[in-house]
């Protein structure tokens, strides 16, 4: 199996400046955090290792020598520039934000299949690339993310804040009433702001907290949420629905809906709410469930999203589309 993955890191100010910039970033910020695409790729590789699947990473020379081999391109589309034009490609996940970025791709390349992480993303991509899009989520490390004893719980609620677009509006309509309610109940609260924490911080809080408030407008998969679910942490999840609202595309270019912030979910995971209007009522239901230990969020992840299961499904896709 030939896997291809690289983080995009183009030159910015002058040729080859990406190399000193990388060194400086590491010195100032520490090692690169495995979020999003990188975390998904690392989890795929871990899953392949666990099931004993054979693979090579970024073997461009080997692919040139065997142009009929399937190139499994994982990550952003800049990698396609390094893949021979005649090579068949299994493309995804974590690719274009929207196929409008290159609607003619299936005519330019031998794209055997495009992989996206959830059903709503599949429906959106199929509007531009019909007939070649399949759902494949990456797995979660359920041996690493495990529940901690109740005695270790010194935080009641972690607020996971991934609100970026229309920030001021949602601060007034969502964050302020949420924090007021948490304070009114006397709950011990910690906050993780997306982009400002390290994965080990979330891992540690997963051991310490009783519940998480998950605030994200929409998610293609929601790996961070699923990691906490695997750790036995129930979620109070904001799920507004409606349109996909990436401002690069919405509303002038793309109007697609409905979307969701928790594409892998059932009632064992916690409680969802739509916005400020139902926040307080829904949180009351949620917190009663937390205190009664009525949720079993880990069970959903173990049943549907283990590293081994998702890696096996990926191997099956490679076999199916590589022939």
Residue ranges and their predicted role:
Residues 31, 124-127, 141-199:
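Conserved catalytic-core segment of nucleotide-activated headgroup transferases in glycan assembly
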Residues 1-77, 312-323:
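N-terminal pre-catalytic "stem/leader" segment of glycosyltransferase-like enzymes
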Residues 203, 226-230, 249-251:
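Short alpha-helical segment that forms part of, or immediately flanks, the ligand-binding pocket
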Residues 113-123, 130-145:
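Donor nucleotide-sugar binding/catalytic pocket of nucleotide-sugar-dependent glycosyltransferases
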Residues 217:
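Aromatic "clamp/platform" in nucleotide-sugar-dependent glycosyltransferases that forms part
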Residues 40-124:
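Extended catalytic core of nucleotide-activated donor transferases of GT-like folds
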Residues 36-39, 272-319:
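A charged, aromatic-enriched C-terminal amphipathic alpha-helix characteristic of glycosyltransferases
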């Amino acid at each position: 199996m030939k896997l291809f993955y690289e983080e995009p890191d183009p030159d910015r100010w002058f040729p080859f400046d990406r190399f000193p910039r990388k060194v400086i970033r590491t010195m100032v910020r520490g090692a690169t955090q495995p979020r999003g695409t990188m975390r998904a790729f690392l989890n795929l590789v871990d899953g392949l290792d666990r099931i004993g699947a054979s693979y090579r990473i970024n073997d461009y020379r080997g692919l040139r020598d065997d142009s009929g081999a399937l190139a499994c391109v994982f990550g952003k589309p800049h990698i396609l520039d390094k893949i021979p034009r005649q090579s068949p490609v299994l493309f995804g996940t974590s690719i274009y934000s929207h196929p409008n970025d290159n609607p003619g791709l299936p005519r330019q390349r031998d794209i055997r299949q495009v992989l996206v992480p959830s059903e709503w993303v599949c429906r959106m991509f199929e509007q531009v690339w019909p007939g070649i899009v399949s759902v494949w989520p990456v797995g979660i490390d359920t041996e690493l993310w495990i529940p901690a004893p109740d005695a270790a719980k010194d935080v009641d609620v972690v607020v996971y804040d991934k609100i970026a677009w229309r920030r001021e509006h949602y601060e007034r309509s969502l964050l302020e009433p949420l924090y007021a309610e948490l304070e009114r109940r006397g709950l011990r609260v910690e906050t993780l702001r997306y982009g400002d924490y390290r994965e080990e911080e979330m891992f540690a809080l997963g051991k310490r907290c009783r519940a998480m408030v998950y605030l994200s407008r929409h998610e293609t998969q929601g790996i961070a949420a699923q990691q906490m679910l695997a750790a036995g942490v129930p979620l109070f999840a904001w799920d507004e629905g409606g349109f996909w609202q990436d401002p690069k595309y919405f509303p002038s270019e793309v109007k697609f809906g409905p979307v969701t912030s928790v594409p892998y979910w059932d009632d064992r995971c916690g409680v969802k709410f739509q916005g400020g209007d139902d926040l307080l009522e829904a949180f009351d239901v949620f917190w009663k469930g937390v205190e009664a230990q009525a949720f079993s969020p880990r069970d959903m992840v173990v049943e549907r999203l283990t590293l081994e299961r998702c890696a096996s499904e990926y191997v099956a896709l490679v076999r199916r589309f590589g022939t």
